[in-house]
């Protein structure tokens, strides 16, 4: 599923809607090894377009251009000079303990005026957590998750304002334990053999939330 390009867009890179996860329990013991497990960020989903000319365009889950709202993320383009890529990830605002702070992110997302955005870069800085790749010189959505993840890791895109968080292949219990200990809300299980399915919600991606006694 693709989204309509914004007015004036040249459409050099494919405009793809993000793949979506279902909410459910962890895969059973017989299927646990068929998935990798990633941190559940509860951030603002974005598709990052790197056309290879030093520019960057960030599209929200609904296809809105939100690039101007997050100027501190523009340095991502310098990490892939001359390369064309489309990346999937989430924008988060972290608290003093390095954990996602949803309220702080909502404050940041509400800002649109340049002066307000500039001021918020200090008080409400954001981080882009990258976890998938859709295009690298050519479409790669048909590749299995493991191959796409290898491509993403090889790009070494960690830098100011960007991270490529680790995945836990076939280690559901460890991933859930780590997530709970670090104060995250859960993990996302991603089937190792699954292609990237733009705009579709399937059990290839399963959002697994912690059941805490204080959250009923």
What are these regions (language model features)?
Residues 1-216:
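Catalytic cores of nucleic-acid ligases and guanylyltransferases
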């Amino acid at each position: 599923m693709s989204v309509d390009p914004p007015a004036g867009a040249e459409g050099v890179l494919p405009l793809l809607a993000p793949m979506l996860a279902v909410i459910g329990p962890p895969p059973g013991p017989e299927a646990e090894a068929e998935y990798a497990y990633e941190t559940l960020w509860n951030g603002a989903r974005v598709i990052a377009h790197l056309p290879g000319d030093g520019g960057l365009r960030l599209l929200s889950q609904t296809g809105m251009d939100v690039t101007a709202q997050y100027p501190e993320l523009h340095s991502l383009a310098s990490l892939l000079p001359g390369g064309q890529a489309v990346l999937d990830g989430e924008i988060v605002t972290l608290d003093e303990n390095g954990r996602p702070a949803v309220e702080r992110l909502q404050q940041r997302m509400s800002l649109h005026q340049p002066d307000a955005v500039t001021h918020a870069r200090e008080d409400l800085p954001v981080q882009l957590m990258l976890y998938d790749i859709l295009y690298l010189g050519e479409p790669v959505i048909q590749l299995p998750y493991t191959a796409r993840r290898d491509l993403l890791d090889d790009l070494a895109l960690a830098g100011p304002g960007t991270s490529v968080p680790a995945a836990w292949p076939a280690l559901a219990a460890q991933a859930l334990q780590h997530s709970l200990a670090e104060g995250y809300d859960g993990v996302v299980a991603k089937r190792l053999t699954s292609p990237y399915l733009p705009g579709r919600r399937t059990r290839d991606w399963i959002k697994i939330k912690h059941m805490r006694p204080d959250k009923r």
